[in-house]
Amino acid sequence: MTDKKVTRLRRARKARLKMHELEVVRLCVFRSSQHIYAQVISADGNKVLASASTLDKELRDGATGNIDAATKVGQLVATRAKAAGVSQVAFDRSGFKYHGRVKALADAAREAGLEF
């Protein structure tokens, strides 16, 4: 693995450990160069309660690797999480900088009703 990826994973591990200690439901984000994925994971970490990505049928036709796509994913994961009975989550950025697509997804999820 590259040094950049190793440091990102180290940051992610530290944040996830803290969330595990607090036993909170988390909104986990992963971004690749072409897509962005979001999952709402239970407090024990064993179950995915809701998920959305740019690979979903509703979002696949449009652009998938930009801020507009991340905003749509954030709105979709928030509505699915609320349908599953989740209203409060901890934001797990997976070691990525809180900037650009990650920030757009988080802001859209907040506007759609999720509390961080």
Swiss-Prot record:
Keyword DNA-binding part of the UniProt annotation: no
Family: Belongs to the universal ribosomal protein uL18 family.
A GO BP entry: translation
Keywords: Ribonucleoprotein, Ribosomal protein, RNA-binding, rRNA-binding
Gene name of the record: rplR
Official protein name in the record: Large ribosomal subunit protein uL18
A single GO molecular function term of this UniProt record: 5S rRNA binding
Subunit: Part of the 50S ribosomal subunit; part of the 5S rRNA/L5/L18/L25 subcomplex. Contacts the 5S and 23S rRNAs.
GO cellular component assignments: cytosolic large ribosomal subunit
Chain's role: This is one of the proteins that bind and probably mediate the attachment of the 5S RNA into the large ribosomal subunit, where it forms part of the central protuberance.
Keyword Phosphoprotein: no
